[in-house]
């Protein structure tokens, strides 16, 4: 596990985009696993900027998103489908046929989950999977006590997760209670994993990810067993770690 600590969120976002961009240049038809939430927004802004400057090309890229709320239409402005188009896909030259997001409105939800994993396998697998992390160490929507072997599935959201996401809705009652998520078994198949974390509220989860016991109670702890994981943190998210744990990135870049 490689750990990179950046001065602030702007530097974290730039570093994450550089790693994704390097993967795209090295392999123009890369398969990217993408995440939602507030943490990767800065990375997406940097990727858009790199695209506009002609540094990267999305025309042959395939993407798979980690998760989507269950029973929330794609056109709802709080759906992850809407989020991804608003924050990335509408601003780049990606082929929309190569964009994959779980269908939260599927009539046969179990079949949708199986189909999603099959599409990932048929794509030759995810080259680099972007993850955020919850305060309770969830990755995707894999909540504590998750079965580590699970593929894509429907999950009942932890109350702490719903409260954390309530800021995006008018009230807690509007936050969906279920979601479709790639399971830790699906995530673990990715060739490389890039986990981003910003803020002191993520520090305990990060410490347990790196130094804690590998247990379903800490879903992200399974990453200790993956062959190629990079954690990109800002100083606040890293403050419980020892300086011997990580390398430091000094540069700061603001996205206008």
Q: Where do the model's predicted regions map?
A:
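N-terminal glycine-/serine-/threonine-rich phosphate-binding loop
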Residues: 1-32
